[in-house]
Curated annotation (Swiss-Prot):
Binding residue positions for substrate: Y105, H106, N107, D181, H215, R219, D224, Q226, E308
Protein name in the entry: Beta-agarase B
Gene designation: agaB
Intrachain S-S bonds: none
Family note: Belongs to the glycosyl hydrolase 16 family.
Summary of subunit composition and partner proteins: Homodimer.
CDD domains linked to this entry: GH16_beta_agarase
S-diacylglycerol cysteine lipid attachment residues: C18
Region Disordered, residue ranges: 30-58
Record's keyword annotation contains Hydrolase: yes
Length: 353
């Protein structure tokens, strides 16, 4: 149980989007800047009366799912959800944790960039999943945590995590990935630090953004498509490392994704031209745009929660130190800043009423 703030908003802007093993590979994946739509007030209404805040104690299972389940449908809670109300020490997670999770990535890969995922860098205590980052002794590598669900999910499904982004230049992530690493949905990807010692400059450009996107891949030769419009980097003025927030996605079908933050729809991507414009999901001759056998995001996916250093940030293509966003030893010495917390993750399927 925890306190959430439900807002009745009478005038709101609906933000609709056009849409390394994974994640970013170069600075070209940064957002195209565009002016954010602003909320407009109803004429004649004072700002104070445009919304009212209601404070209510709600169990995590009973918080309304913000997505529409569809005509004559309702949301059904799935038992693979986890509120982490148990103890799972870093070096011996125990049966309750291991029933739902493996404390590593979904294959033997140890992570991108300077990342080195370790089983003992995640634990459950005080009602939270926690992951922390430390320098690997005698190395530039960074030891970090990663867990993978033992049950896969597939559309139609709503997935939402309540998490607190690290106050770090490292990535805090909640995402989905198919077993063959060809389809990916990013629910949360954020870099929470306000300042980067390695770059020697302000980092608030990133600390105020959440990356919400998807990828389709061809693995050999490696090719990666993801939307690069500004809508894939959500921003509303919030600095995401300050408190817990809810990050969710409704994976309605292979061609439709809806992203929600704190229960508000912030991005929709829908249709073949935004999900897979390069025909990477063709069942025959992937990448050949002369034929169309695209499947879209149709594969079962693992749920992955992790922290990571990413190649495009620690080894930028420019080679410039001013573009190098990886934590220094001094920054890593602050364990609190480099700890990612997840209060819960919940999964729902639409079923007939």
């Amino acid at each position: 149980m925890y306190l959430i703030y439900l807002r009745l908003v009478f005038c709101c802007a609906l933000l609709l989007g056009c849409g390394d093993n994974s994640k970013f590979d170069s600075a070209t994946d940064l957002p195209v800047e565009q002016e954010q739509e602003q909320e407009t007030e109803q004429e004649g209404e004072p700002e104070e009366s445009s919304e009212q805040d209601l404070v209510e104690e709600v169990d995590w299972k009973d918080i309304p799912v913000p997505a529409d389940a569809g005509p004559n449908m309702k949301w059904e809670f799935q038992e693979i959800s986890d509120n982490f109300e148990y103890e799972a020490p870093a070096d011996n997670k125990g049966s309750e944790f291991l029933e739902k999770w493996d404390d590593f990535y979904h294959n033997a890969w140890a992570g991108p960039g300077l990342t080195e995922w370790k089983r003992d860098r995640s634990y459950v205590a005080d009602g939270e999943l926690k992951m922390w980052a430390t320098r690997k002794p005698g190395s530039d590598k960074i030891n970090m945590g990663c867990i993978t669900s033992k049950t896969r999910v597939v559309y139609p499904v709503y997935i939402e995590a309540r998490a607190k982004v690290m106050n770090s230049t490292l990535a805090s992530d909640v995402w989905l990935l198919s077993a063959d690493d060809t389809q990916e949905i990013d629910i949360l990807e954020a870099y929470g630090a306000d300042y980067s010692e390695s770059a020697g400059k302000d980092h608030s450009y990133f600390s105020k953004k959440v990356h919400i996107s998807h990828h389709v891949f061809i693995r050999d030769p490696f090719q990666d498509y993801q939307p690069k419009d500004a809508g894939s980097w959500f921003e509303d003025g919030t600095v995401w490392n300050k408190e817990f927030h809810r990050f969710g996605v409704y994976w309605r079908d292979p061609w439709h994704l809806e992203y929600y933050i704190d229960g508000v729809l912030v991005r929709t991507v829908s249709g073949k031209d935004i999900i897979d414009p390069k025909h990477f999901t063709n069942t025959t001759d992937p990448g050949n745009t002369e034929i169309d056998t695209r499947t879209g995001l149709n594969k079962e996916m693992d749920i992955i929660i992790n922290t990571e250093d990413q190649t495009w940030r620690s080894s930028p293509a420019s080679g410039l130190q001013s573009n190098t966003y990886t934590p220094t030893d001094n920054e890593l010495s602050n364990i609190e800043n480099n700890t990612f917390g997840v209060d819960w993750i919940r999964i729902y399927k639409p079923v007939e009423k």
